């Protein structure tokens, strides 16, 4: 797993909408983005690791679905999280 508890808690605290918020769309997208960054770096050095590449594609698809949901429900929150994380769409 790419994220240790301290890093995960830091991300949750940064993107949480409330005090006990750990599962909002923004938090999920931020956590997925960190895992995607980790796997991208991993695959730069381990080019033949096809199982990790498949996992990366699944994570990207999950993040895309969450971002689509957020865009359809609350466009302002979508713009905020997109700009904060540097995601294209």
UniProtKB/Swiss-Prot annotation:
Domain of life: Bacteria
Keyword Protein transport recorded: no
GO BP: any one term: translation
Signal sequence residues: none
Matching PROSITE patterns: RIBOSOMAL_S15
Record flagged with keyword Ribosomal protein: yes
Molecular functions (GO terms): rRNA binding; structural constituent of ribosome
Keywords: Ribonucleoprotein, Ribosomal protein, RNA-binding, rRNA-binding
InterPro entries from the UniProt entry: Ribosomal_uS15 (IPR000589), Ribosomal_uS15_bac-type (IPR005290), uS15_NS1_RNA-bd_sf (IPR009068)
GO cellular component: cytosolic small ribosomal subunit
Alphabetized CDD domains for the sequence: Ribosomal_S15p_S13e
Listed Gene3D superfamilies: 6.10.250.3130, S15/NS1, RNA-binding
SMART domains: Ribosomal_S15
Subunit structure: Part of the 30S ribosomal subunit. Forms a bridge to the 50S subunit in the 70S ribosome, contacting the 23S rRNA.
Family under the similarity heading: Belongs to the universal ribosomal protein uS15 family.
UniProt cross-references to HAMAP family, sorted A to Z: Ribosomal_uS15_B
Task performed by this protein: One of the primary rRNA binding proteins, it binds directly to 16S rRNA where it helps nucleate assembly of the platform of the 30S subunit by binding and bridging several RNA helices of the 16S rRNA.
UniProt name for this protein: Small ribosomal subunit protein uS15
